[in-house]
């Protein structure tokens, strides 16, 4: 008798789960299915599990393919299960190719073809449905988003659109998803649109998606003018759609905790915020070759503006910019100084100059410091006048962090609006206005001073 084992969360049981179990069963005579506990999922960074364990087990049983159901409670359990149950074949979806090659030491490993087109319709007894996602854009961030979406229960990436069809086909082949030849095709297969196209195209793509009654996550920078941002949020409200800017930092637990501590009064009144984010980018990258919309500030400025706006407010005054530019006037390094009614702030961004990146929040009783990469906040400290008094905070940060914004989008779609404070409409509008101001000053030659 050939024994096969496979594992999964099997949350919001859908056709993709059914087909996986069907294919696994066909590999042998006896199928063991491991259903993962919510605690185990959390430990490996999977978010948003909706159904309780017993419901998920019952759905697997009802499929009719499982001869035996076990519970996966700990990371690392798979190898011991294979030995315990004398398993011959370990089966897993093809989206995990390479991840379980180590299991070849214990049994044969088979990667099963995944179901690309997961339907959004659900059994009648389920309250929430699978939210299908369509991606616009095929750059690096789109690939990271797709991988992160797999770690959020209740979502399924259906396919990708790029007006350059060859790029879309290469991307779709790499990630085993469909290609949408038109936006209309995408809209028919998705409830959520993720816009990861070049900066200057965001407005038209977001507007079109909203007008087709889609929820939208748009990569930073959201749009490049204050007016455009207002128009898009107005459309979202009129259509009763969820719209937010995808600055991953805003949604991660560590950054949320940092903002809470800063606002709590622990360091007194906040008077100064200094945010620095630099990285050395490839000289041939889009960021350093796009004369109109490339450069450090447009690429990294949103990250630095985020803590400043959240802690000092939306009512900034004059902003001064100083940049080091190349011969094409693309800023390799930009330093911006902002004035607020009750505080000051500085931003430092660089793609061609490396500096010590950190976030500093200074108050009348103490200060908070988070070292690089603070935009993936896992650790920060609170310091006081008494140097011996240091308070330390830490949080997990999973993967690339995009799973947190996907999770928040699903929560809001399902009626839980408690996370709206993480990045508000007003904050995104203000940041869009600052991007607009920067572009205007750069166009007039008032920025590239060095």
What are these regions (language model features)?
Residues 249-319:
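Predominantly a Rossmann-like dinucleotide-binding segment in NAD(P)-dependent oxidoreductases
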Residues 231-248, 269-273:
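Rossmann-fold dehydrogenase core element
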Residues 33, 181, 218-219, 243-245, ...:
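Hydrophobic residues in well-ordered beta-strands that form the structural core
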Residues 305-379, 406-416, 449:
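Contiguous beta-strand/loop segments that form the cofactor/metal-binding neighborhood of enzyme cores
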Residues 129-174, 444, 448-450:
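N-terminal Rossmann-like dinucleotide-binding module
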Residues 172, 185, 192-195, 408-450:
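C-terminal helix-rich "cap/oligomerization" subdomain common to oxidoreductases
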Residues 145, 175-233:
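Beta-loop-alpha module in the N-terminal Rossmann-like domain of NAD(P)-dependent dehydrogenases
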Residues 1-129:
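Nucleotidyltransferase catalytic core that binds NTPs
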């Amino acid at each position: 008798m050939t024994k096969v084992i496979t594992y999964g969360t099997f949350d919001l049981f859908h056709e993709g789960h059914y087909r996986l179990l069907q294919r696994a069963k066909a590999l042998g005579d006896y199928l063991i299915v491991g259903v993962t506990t919510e605690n185990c999922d959390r430990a490996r960074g999977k978010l948003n599990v909706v159904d309780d364990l017993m419901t998920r087990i019952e759905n697997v049983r009802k499929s009719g393919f499982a001869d035996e159901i076990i519970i996966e409670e700990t990371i690392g359990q798979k190898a011991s299960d294979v030995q315990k149950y004398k398993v011959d074949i370990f089966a897993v979806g093809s989206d995990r190719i390479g991840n379980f090659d180590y299991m070849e030491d214990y049994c044969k490993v088979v990667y099963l073809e995944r179901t690309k087109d997961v339907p959004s319709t659900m059994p009648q007894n389920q309250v929430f449905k699978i939210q299908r996602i369509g991606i616009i854009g095929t750059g690096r961030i789109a690939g990271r988003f797709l991988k992160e979406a797999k770690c959020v229960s209740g979502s399924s990436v259906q396919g990708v659109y790029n007006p350059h069809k060859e790029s879309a086909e290469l991307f779709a082949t790499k990630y085993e998803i469909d290609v949408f030849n038109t936006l209309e095709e995408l809209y028919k297969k998705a409830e959520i649109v993720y816009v990861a196209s070049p900066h200057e195209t965001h407005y038209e793509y977001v507007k079109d998606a909203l007008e087709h009654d889609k929820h939208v996550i748009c990569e930073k920078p959201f749009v490049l003018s204050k007016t455009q941002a207002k128009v898009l949020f107005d459309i979202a409200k009129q259509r009763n759609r969820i719209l937010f800017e995808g600055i991953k930092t805003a949604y991660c637990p560590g950054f949320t905790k940092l903002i809470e501590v800063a606002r709590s009064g622990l360091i007194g009144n906040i008077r100064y915020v200094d945010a620095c984010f630099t990285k050395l980018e490839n000289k041939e990258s889009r960021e350093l070759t796009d004369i109109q919309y490339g450069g450090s500030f447009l690429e990294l400025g949103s990250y630095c503006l985020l803590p400043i706006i959240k802690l000092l407010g939306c009512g900034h005054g004059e902003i001064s910019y100083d940049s080091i530019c190349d011969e094409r006037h693309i800023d390799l390094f930009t330093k911006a100084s902002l004035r607020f009614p009750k505080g000051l702030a500085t931003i430092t961004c660089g793609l061609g100059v490396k500096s010590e990146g950190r976030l500093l929040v200074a108050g009348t009783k103490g200060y908070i410091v988070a070292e690089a990469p603070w935009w993936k906040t896992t650790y920060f400290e609170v310091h006081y006048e008494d140097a011996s008094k240091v308070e330390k905070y830490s949080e997990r940060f999973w993967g690339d962090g995009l799973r947190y914004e996907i999770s928040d989008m699903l929560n809001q779609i399902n009626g839980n609006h408690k996370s709206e404070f993480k990045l508000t409409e007003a904050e995104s509008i203000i940041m869009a206005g600052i991007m607009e101001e920067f572009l205007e000053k750069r166009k007039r030659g008032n920025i590239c001073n060095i």
